[in-house]
Design a protein with these regions (language model features):
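Short, internal strand/loop/helix patches
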Residues: 123-162, 170
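Structural microenvironment flanking redox-active thiols in thiol-disulfide oxidoreductases
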Residues: 89-129, 140-145
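A short beta-strand-turn-helix
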Residues: 53-76, 100
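Short active-site neighborhood of thiol/selenol oxidoreductases, capturing the structured segment around
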Residues: 65-89, 108-109
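N-proximal helix/coil linker or "cap" segments that precede and/or mark the start of modular domains
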Residues: 22-53, 70-72, 116-117, 123-124
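Thiol-/selenol-based redox modules, centered on thioredoxin-like
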Residues: 158-197
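Positively charged n-region of N-terminal signal peptides that target proteins for export
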Residues: 1-10
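C-terminal motif of bacterial Sec signal peptides marking the signal peptidase cleavage site
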Residues: 16-20
């Protein structure tokens, strides 16, 4: 009986590790909001609030607003991850490959929740994976609300050209990232009257 209990506990621990990492396990707090007031509103039944108003710092040190980030994009995929999260690191190569296949009206952006504290490590992880897209390392406004409501990383949300959620988010690493992302991006594009991928 004792061996069965131990085996069951080990299996449960492995399952939790593969599914995602608790955000609180290694994340430091996101700085308080500045600039525009966060809306904190959900556009519909989706998991998290919209991210319509925020200022962010990118990995290269430049500043960007929500309006700048979403400009000209019908769909933005935002993958929130951490340098201390094994499932996040495991999916990074697949994220990098997927990002390179996207058309001009769709973008994949990453947000490293501990990137402001571990900038060099974040940059090295992305470089090793070959990720060439945009990476945020800190953000305020609506992004603060999003991060406060997230319980696990990786968490991926899908938003339209103004930061409204367009479909269900993904919590954890899907077994087939490209398929899961494509399904959600297609749904978002079709809802906007556009052709899918």
């Amino acid at each position: 009986m004792k061996h069965k209990t131990i085996a069951l506990l080990l299996a449960l621990c492995l399952l939790l590790t593969l599914a995602g990492c608790s955000k609180d396990a290694g994340q430091t707090a996101v700085p308080a909001a500045s600039g525009e007031e966060p809306s904190g509103q959900k556009s519909s039944e989706y998991d998290f609030p919209d991210v319509r108003f925020f200022d962010a710092t990118l990995l290269d040190g430049s500043a960007v607003t929500a309006e700048d980030l979403f400009d000209g994009k019908d769909v933005t995929v935002i993958n929130c991850w951490a340098t201390w999260c094994p499932p996040c690191l495991d999916e990074m190569d697949e994220l990098a490959d997927f990002e390179k296949t996207l058309p001009d009206n769709v973008q994949l952006v990453t947000y490293c929740v501990d990137g402001a504290q571990h900038t060099d490590e974040c940059a090295q992880i992305l470089e090793d994976a070959g990720f060439e897209g945009t990476t945020m390392i800190s953000a305020t406004g609506d992004f603060t609300t999003l991060i406060e409501q997230m319980q696990y990383v990786p968490t991926t949300i899908f938003v339209d050209g103004v930061g409204r959620q367009t479909c269900d988010s993904l919590i954890g690493s899907p077994s087939d990232l490209a398929e899961a992302y494509t399904e959600r991006i297609d749904a978002a594009l079709k809802a906007a009257g556009k052709s899918g991928l």
